[in-house]
């Protein structure tokens, strides 16, 4: 009897063990769909991005016009651009839901998978930031100026570092060219790291809603989860197309319809919605260096999650105290997102400061304490 080529061929074997015969817990819910959705987002963004790059000119005198040219003159250019711009928003929605799932179900205890995942988040944020600068609209230019300028808060080397990143004494042509380079390069780095993320995940196998070992109850990924993921994929694409075709500018900033002008500052400089929570944390600290450190820590705190786990149980599924804290954290992040989009005036300043303190308190202090209290309640 001849063996199945799928299981013997060196390349097909890898694909088979990752996507076809992969033993998966039988009880994983729809919250486990987001990994495959993120993979799809990455492929979609890369394809649309490559097609956009074919028609884009990374020069300050041409960038804005070339984007207008894409939307007006290129066959389906408007669709490619709208899908790329809104695809980024969808990417971040899926990322945040994926991370939220990881925190709720204690997936961060797979340390290698969690750390590569957090690094992937940082790389994706960097990619989105440099990509936002490329259309060279008002918000692109001023966003780049404000965010890169934060590095000047670094003692001693700050100013030199900022000028080195700019390639001059202000955000100019050199900045746009290198940002385009980074925006093209980083997604491929993300792809490499994604493979590492999957490699580490397949070393341990998937977690499941109970947080218990599921080795005694595994089912093959295909057809069970391939079809289940396909449903999620169809829903996601339906949502993306609805956004791109009916409300293409819903999540964008109107200031970006104005070409970049270094002599005129927009009334409210703010990033895209997916960075607003971090931007609110940055603004809530009156000191420049302190703000930059808080901004960094708002993401880097994820690396500390495995070390801060005090509970005997893995998931939050059966821990009411931690559940309350988890949902308070989600509500708090929504408040921070809202504050990030508001002007710097009362009462928004104080709300932002309180929400920032609460964000770090929940993650660093309250959740570990709740875990210990719940352990005591069990004994």
Curated annotation (Swiss-Prot):
Localization of this protein: Mitochondrion inner membrane
Keyword Acetylation in record: no
Covalent S-S links between cysteines: none
One cellular-component annotation, GO: mitochondrial inner membrane
UniProt binding sites for heme b b566: 98, 197
GO molecular function terms listed in the Swiss-Prot or TrEMBL record: metal ion binding; ubiquinol-cytochrome-c reductase activity
Cofactor note: Binds 2 heme b groups non-covalently.
Keywords for the protein's UniProt record, in alphabetical order: Electron transport, Heme, Iron, Membrane, Metal-binding, Mitochondrion, Mitochondrion inner membrane, Respiratory chain, Transmembrane, Transmembrane helix, Transport, Ubiquinone
Taxonomic lineage from the root: Eukaryota, Metazoa, Chordata, Craniata, Vertebrata
Full protein name: Cytochrome b
Membrane topology category: Multi-pass membrane protein
Quaternary context: The cytochrome bc1 complex contains 3 respiratory subunits (MT-CYB, CYC1 and UQCRFS1), 2 core proteins (UQCRC1 and UQCRC2) and probably 6 low-molecular weight proteins.
